[in-house]
Regions:
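Flexible "arm" and connector segments at domain edges
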Residues: 1-84, 88-154
């Protein structure tokens, strides 16, 4: 099967690189890769030997757990950056389950954010206001409007 071929290929690469443990395989994932892609590759290497959640829902629960740990770290002046990283890592794992590229997903989210922000700014100008003169509540109302009007699914 295709899966067996892939497993054999991975074993050959492991021998070629003289990697004896799965940890060494993970450590060989280039640090020069974008962090989201590297995280996904490392997670895949762990999954290859069975260290993985059985279902997507379990991976999602892990995100909630990590968010709670970040909240606790913020309250207690703990390891905030570390906990934030754990959330990102857990989110990347969900992307692996859903078979989406986390870099592409984030790039699309950034574009969507900018488009919605542009809507707010243009709407403010039409009302003769600068954004700096508007309250957050006014901008939030325009943001909600932008979500509806700029939604390509409608």
């Amino acid at each position: 099967t295709a899966e067996e071929v892939l497993i054999n290929w991975e074993e050959l690469k492991k021998k070629e690189k003289r990697q004896e443990t799965q940890t060494e395989v993970m450590q060989s994932v280039p640090e020069a890769l974008p962090a989201l892609i590297r995280a996904r590759k490392v997670q895949k290497k762990a999954a290859d030997v069975g260290f993985d959640f059985p279902v997507t829902a379990d991976a999602m629960r892990k995100v909630y757990e990590e968010v709670q740990e970040l909240e606790q770290a913020v309250r207690e002046n703990g390891e905030i950056e570390e906990e934030f990283g754990d959330i990102l890592f857990a989110l990347v794992n969900i992307s692996r389950f859903l078979k989406i590229n986390p870099e592409f997903a984030l790039t699309k989210a950034i574009k969507k954010f900018i488009n919605r922000f542009e809507y707010i700014e243009k709407s403010a100008l039409l009302e003769g206001k600068a954004l700096s003169e508007m309250s957050l509540e006014e901008m939030d109302l325009l943001w909600d409007e932008a979500k509806i009007k700029l939604n390509p699914m409608q």
